[in-house]
């Protein structure tokens, strides 16, 4: 039996991975990690929505030390001001790296993968499915092919059963992910990419701020990828 654990953080990338995994695995588990990020309550409700929508079991695990370490590093994902960028600034690599540093959570992806690996090792092995992609790999070193390759080498030694990381979006940018979401029939408007979401609409769609880098990337990817964006924004990003 082919088993996969999807590391689900609520955004376009992990939502695409969830729908993709549903097609490619016999058993799928959603794993959402809480560490006190400002979008945590919205992320959890989004996870619960897709768990019910796709009939996939969900595990939510709290990791308190990541919150403490994020505050030590000054990550804007847990406190402080969320970075705002324009669409044109997304192409300025130094500006993109600057915003990446401001929301960096110390070793987050490595920690999350380790938790998923422990779960899969206990269950007898399987794949950890992550939303790493080409666009974010340009500014986040732990979203790259090289990171996946090295983590998989470490997992050969760190687990008793066969556990590996699979990154189905690694060659795609947000435009490509948008096209994949459409192909998979995903209800992406119920996902959340915003660093500082403003709650939900009456029918359960997250309300995005429309100003943070993640909102701008989301809107650009959807509009340029499939020519539409059903996301609810407080302020629609300008492209």
UniProtKB/Swiss-Prot annotation:
Transmembrane segments: none annotated. It is an enzyme of class 6 (ligase). Binds 1 zinc ion per subunit. Pathway: Purine metabolism; 7-cyano-7-deazaguanine biosynthesis. It catalyses: 7-carboxy-7-deazaguanine + NH4(+) + ATP = 7-cyano-7-deazaguanine + ADP + phosphate + H2O + H(+). Its cofactor is Zn(2+). Gene3D superfamilies: HUPs. It comes from the Archaea. Its EC number is 6.3.4.20. InterPro entries: QueC, Rossmann-like_a/b/a_fold. ATP binds at residues 8-18. GO terms for molecular function: ATP binding; ligase activity, forming carbon-nitrogen bonds; zinc ion binding. Keywords: ATP-binding, Ligase, Metal-binding, Nucleotide-binding, Zinc. Pfam families: QueC. Zn(2+) binds at residues 194, 209, 212, 215. SUPFAM superfamilies: Adenine nucleotide alpha hydrolases-like (SSF52402). Catalyzes the ATP-dependent conversion of 7-carboxy-7-deazaguanine (CDG) to 7-cyano-7-deazaguanine (preQ(0)). Belongs to the QueC family. This is 7-cyano-7-deazaguanine synthase. The lineage of its organism: Archaea, Methanobacteriati, Methanobacteriota, Thermococci, Thermococcales.
């Amino acid at each position: 039996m082919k088993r996969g654990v999807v590391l689900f953080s609520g955004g376009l990338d992990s939502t695409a991975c969830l729908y993709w995994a549903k097609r490619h695995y016999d058993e799928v588990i959603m794993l959402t990690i809480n560490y006190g990020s400002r979008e945590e309550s919205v992320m959890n409700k989004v996870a619960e929505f897709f768990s019910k929508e796709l009939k996939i079991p969900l595990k939510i695990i709290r990791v308190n030390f990541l919150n403490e370490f994020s505050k030590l590093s000054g990550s804007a994902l847990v406190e402080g001001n969320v970075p705002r960028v324009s669409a044109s600034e997304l192409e300025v690599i130094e500006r993109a790296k600057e915003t990446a540093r401001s929301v960096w959570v110390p070793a987050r992806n490595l920690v999350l993968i380790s938790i998923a690996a422990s779960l899969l090792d206990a269950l007898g092995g399987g794949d950890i499915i992550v939303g790493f992609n080409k666009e974010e790999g340009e500014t986040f070193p732990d979203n790259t092919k090289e990171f996946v390759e090295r983590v998989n080498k470490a997992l050969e030694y760190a687990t008793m059963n066969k556990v590996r990381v699979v990154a189905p979006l690694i060659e795609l940018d947000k435009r490509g992910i948008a096209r994949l979401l459409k192909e998979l029939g995903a209800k992406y408007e119920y996902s959340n990419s915003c660093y500082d979401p403003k709650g939900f609409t009456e029918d359960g769609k997250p309300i995005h701020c429309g100003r943070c880098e993640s909102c701008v990337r989301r809107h650009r990817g959807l509009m340029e990828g499939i020519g539409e964006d059903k996301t609810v924004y407080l302020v629609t990003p300008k492209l």
